[in-house]
From Swiss-Prot:
One of its GO terms (cellular component) is ribonucleoprotein complex. GO terms for molecular function: structural constituent of ribosome. Part of the 50S ribosomal subunit. Belongs to the bacterial ribosomal protein bL31 family. Type B subfamily. This is Large ribosomal subunit protein bL31B. Signal peptide: none annotated. Transmembrane segments: none annotated. The gene is rpmE2. The lineage of its organism: Bacteria, Bacillati, Bacillota, Bacilli, Lactobacillales. It comes from Streptococcus thermophilus (strain ATCC BAA-250 / LMG 18311). InterPro entries: Ribosomal_bL28/bL31-like_sf, Ribosomal_bL31, Ribosomal_bL31_B, Ribosomal_bL31_sf. HAMAP family: Ribosomal_bL31_2.
């Protein structure tokens, strides 16, 4: 492998701006902000949505079902 061509992989704290939830993960993304997390100082990356606020993970997801042509026909003529 060539030296000095790979990005620096390091631990960073991701913060969900919607809920304030923070978690530690590895990343190559750089940030000028830092935060104290579990007694250590890490770079801070702000994200708009995470598993703490995404409807799929929180159980607040709504499923919509598009009616097909047959369903629309049956509704139109009062069948079924």
């Amino acid at each position: 492998m060539k030296k000095d061509i790979h990005p620096d992989y390091r631990p960073v704290v991701f913060m969900d701006t919607t809920t304030g939830y923070q978690f530690l993960s590895g990343s190559t993304k750089h940030s000028n902000e830092t935060v104290e997390f579990e007694g250590e100082t890490y770079p801070l990356i702000r994200v708009e949505i995470s598993s703490d606020s995404h409807p799929f993970y929180t159980g607040r997801q709504k499923f919509t079902q598009a009616d097909g042509r047959v369903d629309r026909f049956n509704k139109k003529y009062g069948l079924k």
